[in-house]
Amino acid sequence: CAGIRAPQGVYLYHHAVDLARSPDGRWWVMNDRTQAASGAGYALENRLLVSRTFPKLYRDMRVQHLARFFATLRDSLLHFAPRGDGPTLVVLLTPGPFNETYFEHALLSRYLGFPLVEGGDLTVRNGRVWLKTIGGLRRVHAILRRQDDSYCDPLELRSDSALGVAGLT
């Protein structure tokens, strides 16, 4: 991907690929995920669990740490979010606890330090996204989306979606 320029400098932040190894040893791409890319949180949790359960084995295997990947993801989202009044707020948008990857959403939200929100937690007013809190509305500067784009805005995309935020797109 070296030398590729994205339109308006907007790059894809997260991409996941489901791989399978064939009996002859070749790798095959089974699925290509850019919508709600999952897997990184599971890899993180797996490493944390194994490092606590088998600390000597984990050290001896010299497993690559993922902290730098997550720090880069977090820093990139904060850096490229539009500047506004007050501190930059990035949220992780999830379809909710009935989604098969909700565990990962909750884990990533906590690890990255971003509030975990559902569509009902957000509102759009005057072209800006706001997080509804007990203390009032807080401006949202960036959204790490963990649901397919077609479900994000029931006004513009899928009128049957109860997961999105009216006016988000």
Identify the role of each PLM range.
Residues C1-T169:
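Domain-scale recognition of functional cores that engage charged ligands
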